[in-house]
Amino acid sequence: WIMGHMVDDIAMVDDFLDNGANGLELDISFDSNGKAEYTYHGTPCDCFRSCTRYESFDKYMEYVREISTPGNQKFRKSLIMLIMYLKLNSLYANQLYTAGSDIADQLARHYWKDDGAARAYMVLSLPSITQTEFIRGFKNRMESQGLQKYYAKIGWDFTGNEDLDDIEATYKKLNITEHIWQSDGITNCLNRGTDRLEDAIRRRDKPGNKYINKVYLWSIDKMSSIRDALDKGVDGIMVNYADRFIDVLKESKYSSKYRLATYEDNPWETFRP
């Protein structure tokens, strides 16, 4: 999975897809009432990137609905996943619950409004395990509005590099045992060790594991780092330059072992060689 990083305006959506991404990460900012407002990262952000490009959340979702709907004249079959990084750190518990409810409402209004014709999978990525009120708000609204069928398209991720045992315990409390991506990473401006990443991969591959289906690394720019991550066995990498990942996949060492995921590949299923 090639996940374009910080794809926060519509022009970048097309640029990343043109360069080979099959997944897009967008940063969702909220107002003081817990309502999703913009796709916007802000400063600081990754080195050599503009931190301030943005779009209104509703307009962004309308656009990705069009390009991920078969039969639409704008359809792009390569777009199969959206990774929604939820900028929740400034919200209190009651606002977190509202934010979860609002995301469910806005997805129903702007993305699934054609009775689910738009086909992208979505990973809801939370900064911390302390923000589970968002998940409760999201699930309660989905169920009260009869939107449970869309759970098949929803996955989960905690992206704050927290202890993996604590993350597992959180999923147990939430009764979430599937559709789990586990991230590990840091801004491309800094180096990070790989111990936690390797531990996540071991847990993913452990027989009987219920709490990690896929593992991805963020955010990587160097081709040598992409190779190293593939050698370790990640399922996806979040990148600023998707074409570099494509070039690595063309190398003989990797072309015989890896291929770009397609819509027919289940993003919630652990790959077993």
UniProtKB/Swiss-Prot annotation:
Catalytic EC class: lyase
Entry cofactors: Mg(2+)
Active site: residue positions: 5, 41 (nucleophile)
Positions that bind Mg(2+): 25, 27
Localization of this protein: Secreted
Paired cysteines (S-S): 45-51, 47-189
Similarity comment: family membership: Belongs to the arthropod phospholipase D family. Class II subfamily.
Biological function: Dermonecrotic toxins cleave the phosphodiester linkage between the phosphate and headgroup of certain phospholipids (sphingolipid and lysolipid substrates), forming an alcohol (often choline) and a cyclic phosphate. This toxin acts on sphingomyelin (SM). It may also act on ceramide phosphoethanolamine (CPE), lysophosphatidylcholine (LPC) and lysophosphatidylethanolamine (LPE), but not on lysophosphatidylserine (LPS), and lysophosphatidylglycerol (LPG). It acts by transphosphatidylation, releasing exclusively cyclic phosphate products as second products.
Record protein name field: Dermonecrotic toxin SdSicTox-betaIF1
